[in-house]
Amino acid sequence: MNESETLLQFYTWSIFLMSYLIGSIPFGLLFTRLAKLGDVRAIGSGNIGATNVLRTGNKKVATLTLLCDILKGTVVVLVIKFLNDPIENSIIISLVGFFAFLGHLFPIWLKFKGGKGVATYLGVCLGYYWPAAIVFIIVWIMFFILTRYSSLSALIAVIITPIFVYFSYPHLYAHCILVMMSIFVIIKHHANIARLLIGKESKIGTQNRDK
């Protein structure tokens, strides 16, 4: 391996590490503490995501958490797309989003106990292929209106979005990584799925655990 190849590998893995660290920022925990709402991990489901932050009763903090969790997936992808050719470096750009997503799920700052990845998943889609983000949002809103289940809406959205990408976006790497992200989201929702199956999953606006 020559010097240029070594530098390229160092550059690539440095980007992945930086993406992971950005994804690891626990905005939900930080914002609830700054707003003196307590430790969000001790509220509701114990999740650090926007849905659980909403259970504090502070809609502004929940909205801010949602936006920041989305943006940390979007920004890293857009920055790398700006610095690299989107066609020649599609696998690197896809992996950058994946590492940011993994950071949210397994943040180093919280002993690798993070969120469920829905907002960051959406953010990665928005940065890499915005029509996928639009499909995700439409599906989520539609099923949320029908069911009032945030978790079920997210699960259906992460199943339908990769199918849409498969038929509309001709990049195998991007599709494979999106499928892996969907699998992670589904696994992270295993408790929600169990409650849905026995009819004990709570809907938005109730006091029981949701996400």
From Swiss-Prot:
Belongs to the PlsY family. Keywords: Cell inner membrane, Cell membrane, Lipid biosynthesis, Lipid metabolism, Membrane, Phospholipid biosynthesis, Phospholipid metabolism, Transferase, Transmembrane, Transmembrane helix. Coiled coil: none annotated. This is Glycerol-3-phosphate acyltransferase. Its EC number is 2.3.1.275. It catalyses: an acyl phosphate + sn-glycerol 3-phosphate = a 1-acyl-sn-glycero-3-phosphate + phosphate. The keyword Kinase does not apply. The keyword Lipid biosynthesis applies. PANTHER family: GLYCEROL-3-PHOSPHATE ACYLTRANSFERASE-RELATED (PTHR30309:SF0), INNER MEMBRANE PROTEIN YGIH (PTHR30309). It is a multi-pass membrane protein. It is found in: Cell inner membrane. Probably interacts with PlsX. Pathway: Lipid metabolism; phospholipid metabolism. GO terms for cellular component: plasma membrane. One of its GO terms (molecular function) is acyl-phosphate glycerol-3-phosphate acyltransferase activity. The chain crosses the membrane at residues 10-30, 63-83, 90-110, 126-146, 152-172, 174-194. GO terms for biological process: phospholipid biosynthetic process. It is an enzyme of class 2 (transferase). SMART domains: G3P_acyltransf (SM01207). HAMAP family: PlsY. InterPro entries: G3P_acylTferase_PlsY. It holds the Pfam family G3P_acyltransf. Catalyzes the transfer of an acyl group from acyl-phosphate (acyl-PO(4)) to glycerol-3-phosphate (G3P) to form lysophosphatidic acid (LPA). This enzyme utilizes acyl-phosphate as fatty acyl donor, but not acyl-CoA or acyl-ACP.
